[in-house]
Amino acid sequence: KLAIHLAKKLNGEIINADSMQVYKEFRILSSRPSNSEIKKAKHHLYGLISVKKYFSAGDWLKEVKKKIKLSLKNKKLPIIVGGTGLYFNTITKGISKIPDIDSRTRAKVRNLFNKLGYQKFYEKLLILDPKIKNKILPSDSQRTQRAYEVKLKTKKSLLDWIANTKSDFLDYDIKKI
């Protein structure tokens, strides 16, 4: 509601930064704006992709950059809203240039995770990449699997990629509310 109010008052457009609301299938689960709210102000990056497709923070950054540029070109103020800190950080601090991981490797890691469960998978990850200890919780299935697939494919710790390769942040005057 605040975003809609700001969009009307400041001649703006709303751009989604919630990692669940980008998915078509999560309309109800993610409190996506209603049709009546969407009519009140232009909304972008809601229901963008199917959950069946891989969509990373880097993918979101590419999309949001296009939408911000388009909004500014149309003399509109981009108003970025949502709940994913990682997405906001990609805009303000940049994102690590981690090489793409092929779908076969991702599937292999997911299958291993499903077979072993949280704790045993985490223990296996620590053998593969000891640097991860105390940096990623065993219960964080998304990050543990990402760390595993990155180490498996690149032979380099996810933490090394994160520490050494930040780029692509947006150099705009950003106000946070």
PLM regions: where:
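Phosphate/pyrophosphate-binding catalytic cores of soluble transferases and nucleic-acid-acting enzymes
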Residues: 1-177
